[in-house]
Structure formats: structure tokens, C-alpha cells
Amino acid sequence: MSIPGFGGTNGSLASDSSEFTQISIPPANEWRIEVPFKKLLKLKVTLGTLEINGSELPNNVELQLSGVKLPIYAPPSINKEHAKVEYKLVTNPDQSVLLSSEDEEFTQYLSDETNMDLVVNLAMYIESKRQIAKDLKTNEGDHALGPRVLILGGKYLGKTSLAKTLVSYAVKMGSSPVLVNLDPKHGVFALPGSLSATVINDSLDIECANGYGFTMTTTGSLSKSMKQPVVKNFGFSDVDENVKLYTRQIDQLGIAVLSKLEGIEDGSGSEVDGNHNKVRSSGVIVDTPPFTMKSFDIISSIVSDLKIDLIVVLGNEKMKIDLTKKLKHKIEQGSLNIIKLSKSPGVVDDVNDRFIRMTQEQTIREYFNGNHRIRLSPFKTEIDLPSSSSSASASASVSSSSSTSSSGLVIYKSVLTKEYESSMAFLPSGDDFEHITNEDENGGDGNDGDGRGIVEDIKEYYQILEDPNSSNLDNSIVAITHLPLESGSSSVTNGASGSLNMSSKRKRELLNTSVMGYIHVSKVDDEKKKMKILLPFPGVFPRNVLIATSIGYNE
């Protein structure tokens, strides 16, 4: 039996002779579990209703979870019947996981302390705002914009779990909200190091790494169940690595999201939902990295770029008060409301960096190889190493029998702010930076695609990777953008003080482009000038601009 988002076993697990253990979960209680990566938890709901982050678990279907710390919630029932689960712990057959130095063990316990009643009330309040949006019509006959919800808070408060729950409850009630992920540590329908926005119209896949699901960029499939995200490259896991690039990508993601709500093609390569009225009234749920009031400038940008009208502050009364003061003008205008929600008593507050890194590796591994339920066939090939002297030329089809000629490829990299500032410190006094001006040399108006003039230094965002080699590309993730290479043009290089000798129009295109997909560079042969890469599926290697990220991965 197979249900989208909930797959049965396929017999590939390591055999285990242990018997299933049964546990009874009272209504309005949580069964809290922590499953290490070296183990697999096989479980089956045999009676009643249970949820993981708002996604209802099917009865009598075996599920598999690994590397998770989460609660399984039993909603209140009229007859007060206990839900029942059978579970068994087995060794994870994934050898790459077994080779890790993880020392965590499986833990589980029941608790009647939960904030789910507050979460349900919040979900119903948001749904009431969606209904109001459906009832209100624009001059064009469209629904009004639905609620745009921003979830804020510090570390280990359950922001991501809340975002998943609100999205899942919205889908249950017939809505299709846009889930926006602004935490580059997570790969939400994308890989770590990215920001994404995805229309959610069916259940999240709790068995997938991070508990989201597959995308068409992974499988090459246009299956209805595959999500089609808008993905912006950031290239780092930590926002502080380049705050300017981060806020600029939020701005561009905001344009894409609002275009999607308007039913306008946004140029990102993501298809506009045919039923944009439903998406429009369903609104937006925004998940964020840990923020404090020191990050207010970023928070303010998010509120403006995504037209946020409801901020949910998790577990921090002081932050709620400070935000109310800072955003008083919006509150008085009636365009913004700020509420505080108590954090779940079951939030795990000892998640270490190693667990986060292993979760990232699982996300990347699943992107290329799939999981126990959906097996993917990643494609390995060898291509020419880009060089600073290469000119744009036609790409060839990826073939297992020969290397792909890719001498026209150009690889950029996201700029680490501290490295950029260090390089600027050595400039002679009075030297200016190369800026994108309001009137470029090609006669453009300097507009950034949304009618606004921009004046900024592109060197603060991207630089060309002038000397691609094993030291800077081995075991790395590279983003393939939607931006085509310029055919017949001369090569792009870093000029004086790292400037890019390309037109202002081209620089804007680079800054505004979205991510089509990813490749993994497993090894670079510096002598032969070749690099071995892994693609999610066979096909024509895109003749598009590439951006190297700081996200590493070993097969």
C-alpha cells in the first residue's frame, strides 16, 4: 500500500528479530521521540488519529523515521479513545550514516504538557482571515490577499514545527498557502544554503529528510505531487556570512512570492499556479532563522518585502513588546498585528551542530539518491573544468560514454563579507567600488526588474571563481541558475579590486536569478582540467550560469 507522503517498506531494511512494541497515547497528549541517524524507527498507527506537525498519519501503514526529534500528537477525541501505535527500532542500513561518530540513543516518552490547543486556535484564526480574503474581491474580481504570517523567535523554540503545522492544517481546510523558508541552514524543497518559496497543496512527506518532500528539480518529474519551489541562492548556512546578500535575496524572493499571489509569471522558472485565486487567498507562512532584536533591520525588510500582516513571536514576551514599539506605525495603520505564542514544552533545546550537519547531509543525499520509498538514479559524468580564459560556447548533452565539453561554463561564488571587507582595507585611499548605476553603459535605466533604481556594489554579493580547482570545488554543492550564459561574449573575470567586467544589466540578471537545481562536484582533476559531477537525473547539462556554495558534501 502506498499513500503520497506516507510510504510502506520495500524490504530493503536490515532484518531485525525484535518484536513490535505497542504504546497507547491518550487524547491531547504527545508521544515524544528522538531517533538517532544510526537507527530507523518503524511505526504503524493501529487505532485512532495521530499527527506529526499537523500531518495526519495513515492507519495501518508502516512509516520509517530516522534522525528526528519530534512529538507525535493525539488530538482530542469525542469518545476519549486512546490512539495506539506499534513501533520497532532497527539498525539503519545506510552505511554512510553508520560511519558517523554519532553517540545519541533512541528516547521516547509520553507527555500531557503541550501547546497544541494554542496552535489550533492560531490556525483557526488564520483560517478566518483566509475566509475574509475570499469574501473580499478586487476590482478585477480576484480574492483579496490572504494572511501573510511571519514566525519569529530565538533558538530551539519550535518555529519550523509551527510553520509545518500551520501549513498542514491549512491544506486540511482546503487552502494552498505559500511556505517561505528564510533559514539557510535548512533545505526546504531545495538544498541547504538557499531560501525558498513553495505553494503547498497536499500533505508534507514526513518520511523525507527534514519532513517536507521531493521537488521536480530532484526527480525531473512534473508529477502533481512534486513541489515546484522558487529558490534563491545564498550559498551559506549562517545569515551573518553575508547579511547584504541575504536581505537582497529576501527582497527578490518577496517579488517572486507576490507575483505568484497575483498570478503573474515571475521569471524564476517556476510555473504560476493555475488556480492563483486559491493561492492568493491562502496567504503565506514564513519560517525564519533564530532572530533577536539585534536583527531588527532584517526583520523589517521581511515585513516590507512579503507584506507581512501577522507576526507570531514564539516564547519571548520581551521581543513581542520591542517589536510592537518598533512597528507601532504599522499597527496603528491596521496593517500589522503582533501576537505571542508560548513555545511547546516538548521543544528539544540541546540540538548540537553535528545533528544539524547530519540533517543537512541527509537532505543532500536524498536530493540526489532518493530514500527508501522513492529511489532516484543520479547521473555521474565528467566535464571540462571552467577556466578564466574560456568563452561561452554551446554545451553538449551529458553522456555516460564521454566527457561533456563545457569550456563555456562560468562559475561564480557568494562573497564572504569578512573576506570582502579585508580585501577592501588594502585599496588606496579614495578608490571607489564598481557600482550598478541607475544608467548602465548599455542604455538601461538601472531598474531592478520591479521599477526601482538600484545603486549597489555587486562585489559585496558575487565574484567570479577565477581559478576553479580541487581546493575550492572538491566535495562541494554548486547551484545551476536559470540565467543562460551569454553566447558569443568574452569571458567574465574579476577586474581591479575584484570587480566583475560585465554590463550593469548582466549584473542585475545575476543578482535576480533563481536556482534551477544543483550538482555535486565530487572530485576535480587539476592536471586534466576535468571535474567529476553528480546530477539528479540524466539530461542535457544546462548552458546556464553556475554559483559555487560553501555547502560541502561527501558521497
From Swiss-Prot:
Question: Would I find Nucleus among this entry's keywords?
Answer: yes
**What segment(s) does the record annotate as region Disordered?**
431-451
The record's principal subcellular location, in a coarse class, is nucleus
Please list the GO biological process terms of this entry: mRNA 3'-end processing; tRNA splicing, via endonucleolytic cleavage and ligation
Q: Which InterPro entries does this chain map to? A: Clp1 (IPR028606), Clp1/Grc3 (IPR045116), Clp1_C (IPR010655), Clp1_C_sf (IPR038238), Clp1_N (IPR032324), Clp1_N_sf (IPR038239), CLP1_P (IPR032319), P-loop_NTPase (IPR027417)
UniProt keyword Chaperone present:
no
An example GO CC term for this entry is: mRNA cleavage factor complex
Q: Which domain of life is it from?
A: Eukaryota
Cellular location of this protein?
A: Nucleus
Q: Name one Pfam family in it.
A: CLP1_P
- Where along the chain is ATP bound? E30, K69, Y156, L157, G158, K159, T160, S161
MF terms in GO: ATP binding; polynucleotide 5'-hydroxyl-kinase activity
User: Mind listing the UniProt keywords for this protein, alphabetically?
Assistant: ATP-binding, mRNA processing, Nucleotide-binding, Nucleus
Q: Which purpose does this protein serve, as stated in its record?
A: Required for endonucleolytic cleavage during polyadenylation-dependent pre-mRNA 3'-end formation.
Q: Which family does it belong to?
A: Belongs to the Clp1 family. Clp1 subfamily.
Relate the assembly described in the record.
Answer: Component of a pre-mRNA cleavage factor complex. Interacts directly with PCF11.
Name this polypeptide is given? mRNA cleavage and polyadenylation factor CLP1
Species this chain originates from: Lodderomyces elongisporus (strain ATCC 11503 / CBS 2605 / JCM 1781 / NBRC 1676 / NRRL YB-4239)
**Gene name, please?**
CLP1
